[in-house]
């Protein structure tokens, strides 16, 4: 689960994996990440060179577009880094970089990156008409010697993943079919 750095719930969202956090908000089994924008990082960088710089960061309601609260970008960044040291999360995704580096043909189709998988190696563009799904597999390197000599092994793994997606598409409930 990713949340934008400007979302009004970002402070609570950051705390959800902290074992000492609010018990009503704790989600120790849910992994989470933050979409960090260029503008946020520019404010943080400016504060590093000028301690008196304005570090106000607006938390904006995504539905109304109204500013709900203004917080210190420097303190928010420090909180993110401290939580990463304590819990290993949140994951960080530089959303503007992902959108800037997207292929031109995808941009021309009106696609946009909204989030990533948590490890950030899979970043798929979407829009209202196009949903993306990431189907991953892993191979146990302990058994590398056993499978590396099998010429069809990786092809079989890829085909198995394709079969998983095909099965889902063919058996999806009507409300999620297009």
Where are these regions (language model features)?
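Active-site cavity-forming subdomains of large catalytic enzyme subunits
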Residues: 1-151, 170-178
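An acidic intrinsically disordered interaction segment
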Residues: 149-167
């Amino acid at each position: 689960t990713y949340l934008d750095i400007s979302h009004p719930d970002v402070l609570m969202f950051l705390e959800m994996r902290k074992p000492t956090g609010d018990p009503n908000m704790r989600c120790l089994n849910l992994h989470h990440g933050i979409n960090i924008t260029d503008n946020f990082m520019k404010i943080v960088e400016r504060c590093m060179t000028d301690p008196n710089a304005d570090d106000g960061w607006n938390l904006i309601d995504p539905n109304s577009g109204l500013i709900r609260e203004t917080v210190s970008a420097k303190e928010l960044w420090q909180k993110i880094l401290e939580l990463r040291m304590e819990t290993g999360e949140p994951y960080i995704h530089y959303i503007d970089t992902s959108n800037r580096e997207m292929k031109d043909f995808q941009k021309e189709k009106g696609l946009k990156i909204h989030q990533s998988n948590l490890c950030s190696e899979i970043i798929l563009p979407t829009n209202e008409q196009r949903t993306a799904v990431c189907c991953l597999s892993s191979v146990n390197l302990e058994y590398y010697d056993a499978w590396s000599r099998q010429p069809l092994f990786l092809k079989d793994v890829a085909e198995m993943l394709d079969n998983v997606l095909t099965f889902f598409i063919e058996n999806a409930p009507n409300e999620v079919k297009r």
